Structure formats: C-alpha cells, structure tokens
C-alpha cells in the first residue's frame, strides 16, 4: 500500500495502517 501521509490515515487500498 502507498501511504500518502506520515500518519498513515490514507492508504491506497484504504487499509488501516495507523502504526505511526
């Protein structure tokens, strides 16, 4: 997935990757 911001709130597949 491609993270558009440093907070990981918006990814390409919409996956919850809020591990920052």
UniProtKB/Swiss-Prot annotation:
Keywords: Cell outer membrane, Ion transport, Membrane, Porin, Transmembrane, Transmembrane beta strand, Transport. One of its GO terms (biological process) is monoatomic ion transport. The keyword Repressor does not apply. Signal peptide: none annotated. GO terms for molecular function: porin activity. It is found in: Cell outer membrane. GO terms for cellular component: cell outer membrane; pore complex. It comes from the Bacteria. Its main location: membrane. This is 39 kDa major outer membrane protein. It comes from Aggregatibacter actinomycetemcomitans.
């Amino acid at each position: 997935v491609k993270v558009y911001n440093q907070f990981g709130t918006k990814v390409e597949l919409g996956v919850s990757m809020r591990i920052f």
